[in-house]
Amino acid sequence: MHIAPYENLNKPIVDVHNELVPLNYFNIVKLNKGEVFDYSVDGYETCIVPATGKVSVDIEGMNFDQLGNRGTDVWDGEPEGVYAPTGAKVRIVCQSDTTETFIAGAKFDKILEPFDVRNAEIDLVQYGSDETKTHRKIKHILGANQHGKVGRLLVSELFTVGQGGWSGFPSHKHDTDRLPDETRHDETYNFRFKPNYGSGLQMLQREDNKAGDAYHIVDGSTMLIDKGYHPCAVLPGYEMYYFTILGGLSQRSLKQYFQPTHEEQLHTIPGIMDMVAKFK
């Protein structure tokens, strides 16, 4: 499902118990300097990631100050994040002139400890090639390095490095719990383009070798991935970014099932298996 960009007024774009992706939660919070946003999400662990600007985050009296390194857009610096336990009372205060801050969440009933992930701790994976139109960079905020400290939530930022490139290919899905072949992970994306008048295409193919759906995605588009194979592409001449939220049903580690029709392409894309190993 595609949600076109709109002014959400700091209210969740993907709220708890969403009909399509009930394992996910997503909000975009926009604040001016000194403004405050308070929240608590029962039954969901969350992660606060400034897209732009700098904030302080207080979680039940534990303070994480000066979070965020980016100025004008998501290309302007490295990401940082703070993990907030399930149901915790969180206060975000804008410390820069303005901020746009993402709040990602996954359904989880246990209470863990809060922690921050600063830019030096971001786990970077780069794979693909310009020749195969799959050159991609992934910055894991809550990834394999945080395994054991987080319940079900995976948070990352994905950059399509080559202009006119593809992401999420070879096509894969993760909509059914059937280990060891696949896990169920609901997924939510928020897209940005450089320049911001760029756009792209999100495919969603429900069954192998049957026609699926395609969505025109623009700067600020949100996609809910509930079922099926889901590659996406950016127009030539533009770069694409998408903030990625994964919430697992029974485990945190993601097991992707690659589409049989295109599985041989796994052997043509440099470094792709290293990428797969990082979603743990």
Question: At which residue positions do the language-model features occur?
Answer:
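Conserved hydrophobic/aromatic beta-strand scaffold that supports enzyme active sites
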Residues: 26-30, 81-83, 103, 155-159, ...
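A short glycine-rich, His/Asp/Glu-containing loop-to-beta-strand
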Residues: 6-38, 135-188
